[in-house]
């Protein structure tokens, strides 16, 4: 019956049963057993399961009279005929013997009502253990109408046309969510759609990315967008010596070349000293000058590591400037970290003639320390915002931003701290072919911390998303039936899964507002230059019209 519950057909299934005389019932089963034995069909005998009932040495099982009816409904005769044939076909595929009523049609209809035993026409014997074996009506997930933040984020339409109440949080009230899919699968569109629907909670949003496709969306929800130079110093964002210690571990390369116990002791005291400094005075140049490294046996090596870090121009600029970027409650802040990614580094890096390979490696490692330090301090500052209002940390293209060696041992602390402060992480992940990241210990650990997973099909052949997402055999079988062009995707939450749809066909402007391509961004910037006002009320309608007509 579960297969029928998934069908796009309205019906009522009714089961009627009442206790039967034991002797009469066992005689009926004995007659059936003799007929089957005469047929010499051993498989049929095994399938029917009559022998164990007839030959049981134990107390006779309890018997009952049983009738099951399925009443199918439709608005026209033709549609009714079609639906009857559809349900009948599904029952046949599952080996369920059934008949279509004609002469007894009226009696069978009235027999569905309580107490109308005189109208029952198709009863048969059954053992009481088989009663009420239709299906649990709650078997098909419907989500939760309310979560920790209030009403559900949105309502998706399932593949069967039923509603699914979508929430970041599961039944344990943990809301970390990961959106996974291949290139051009619609990951950003779904992520930003969920963010727009979550605006009813008035959340504080920190949006970390390495691309510009969400720029129109962020500005449309009155957020601020930061490209290129970052107007903040990570040292000034941290509010505890423990967090400063972690930051110093990151920028001194501890996760690539472990610090000794003596070096850890030195940077621990350094973190305490920096904590006593006013946030606006925390520049690495000043710290190196003021802190007495000579008092520590490993002071010289720690100082050397810090100097090596700020010998890089980007590192020096970030860690020696004043902070003007403020993360405030109920605000939306987006930061494009493209200039700090491996891709941008490889695009701009030109090795010197005769340069040793380790120089490239060391510079890339310094970039990893810088990017990790920036992200760590931003997340810490964001997590500890005083407001109890919802917080959403978005990490777009997570594998391009997160350095797994650094964050491997930090993700548990980060996810738990955000949850305690009414926050969630919404990570967006593009799965690429032959990328070892998705087989790493970090990725396996990350999946465990995400209570909700949204998994999108892809056009890339032989891309093992089911394996990467650790789907069960049943889940993988279902996921592999989804066409990439169907606009369907899988939501996995609370040990259940459901296939839902986000169909924006016919709404090109909304799709582009959620995730803009390069030509859309160019059009947006032209309109902004013409209008000269950043307020969404001044430009949003014009941009919408242009996007709608540019399809």
Spans of model-derived segments:
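Conserved SF1/SF2 helicase motif Ia
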Residues: 201-202
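Short beta-strand/turn micro-motifs at beta-sheet edges
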Residues: 53-60, 166-167, 321-324
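P-loop NTPase motor core of the ASCE superfamily
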Residues: 168, 177, 245-286, 437-551
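Extended, folded cores of ATP/NTP-driven motor/assembly subunits in large transport
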Residues: 1-131
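P-loop NTPase motor domains
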Residues: 108-164, 210, 215, 219-225, ...
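Conserved P-loop NTPase motor cores
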Residues: 160-196, 205-213, 224-229, 345, ...
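A generic structural motif
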Residues: 15-16, 69-79, 94-107, 182-185, 225-231, 341, 399, 425-429, ...
């Amino acid at each position: 019956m579960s297969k029928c519950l998934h069908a796009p057909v309205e019906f009522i299934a009714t089961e009627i049963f009442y206790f039967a005389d034991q002797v009469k019932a066992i005689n009926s089963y004995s007659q059936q057993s003799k007929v089957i034995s005469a047929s010499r069909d051993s498989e049929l005998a095994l399938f029917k399961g009559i022998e164990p009932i007839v030959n049981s040495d134990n107390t006779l099982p309890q018997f009952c009279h049983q009738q099951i009816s399925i009443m199918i409904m439709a608005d026209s005769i033709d549609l009714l005929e079609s639906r009857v044939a559809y349900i009948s076909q599904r029952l046949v595929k599952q080996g369920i013997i059934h008949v279509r009523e004609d002469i007894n049609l009226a009696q069978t209809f009235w027999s569905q009502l309580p107490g109308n035993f005189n109208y029952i026409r198709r009863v048969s014997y059954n053992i009481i253990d088989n009663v009420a074996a239709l299906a649990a009506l709650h078997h098909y997930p419907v989500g939760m109408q309310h979560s920790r933040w209030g009403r559900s984020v949105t309502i998706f339409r399932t593949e069967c046309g039923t509603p699914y109440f979508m929430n970041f949080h599961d039944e344990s009230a943990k809301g970390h969510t990961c959106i996974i899919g291949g290139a051009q699968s619609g990951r950003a569109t779904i992520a930003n759609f969920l963010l727009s629907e979550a605006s009813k909670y008035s959340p504080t949003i920190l949006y970390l990315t390495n691309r510009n496709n969400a720029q129109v969306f962020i500005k449309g929800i009155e957020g601020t967008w930061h490209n290129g130079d970052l107007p903040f110093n990570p040292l000034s964002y941290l509010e505890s010596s423990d967090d400063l210690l972690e930051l110093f571990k990151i920028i001194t390369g501890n996760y690539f070349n472990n610090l000794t116990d003596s070096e850890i002791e030195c940077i621990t005291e350094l973190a305490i000293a920096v904590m006593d400094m006013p946030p606006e005075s925390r520049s690495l140049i000043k710290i190196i000058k003021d802190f007495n490294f000579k008092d520590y046996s490993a002071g010289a090596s720690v100082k050397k590591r810090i100097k090596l870090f700020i010998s890089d121009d980007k590192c020096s600029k970030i860690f020696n400037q004043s902070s003007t970027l403020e993360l405030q409650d109920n605000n939306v802040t987006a930061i494009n970290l493209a200039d700090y990614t491996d891709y941008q580094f490889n695009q701009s890096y030109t090795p010197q003639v005769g340069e040793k390979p380790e120089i490239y490696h060391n510079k890339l490692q310094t970039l990893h320390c810088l990017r990790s330090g920036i992200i760590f301090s931003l997340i810490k500052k964001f997590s500890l915002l005083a407001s109890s209002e919802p917080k959403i940390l978005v990490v777009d293209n997570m594998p391009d931003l997160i350095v797994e060696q650094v964050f491997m041992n930090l993700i548990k602390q980060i996810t738990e701290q955000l949850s305690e402060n009414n926050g969630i992480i919404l990570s967006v992940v593009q799965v690429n072919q032959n990328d070892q990241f998705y087989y790493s210990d970090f990725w396996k650990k990350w999946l465990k911390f995400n209570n909700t997973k949204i998994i999108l099909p892809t056009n890339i052949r032989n891309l093992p998303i089911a394996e990467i997402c650790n789907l069960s055999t049943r889940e993988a079988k279902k996921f592999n039936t989804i066409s990439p062009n169907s606009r369907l995707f899988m939501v996995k939450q609370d040990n259940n899964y459901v296939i839902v749809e986000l169909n924006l066909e016919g709404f090109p402007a909304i799709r582009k507002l959620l995730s803009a391509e390069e030509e859309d961004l160019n059009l947006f910037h032209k309109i902004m230059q013409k209008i000269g006002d950043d307020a969404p009320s001044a430009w949003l309608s014009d941009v919408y019209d242009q996007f709608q007509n540019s399809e």
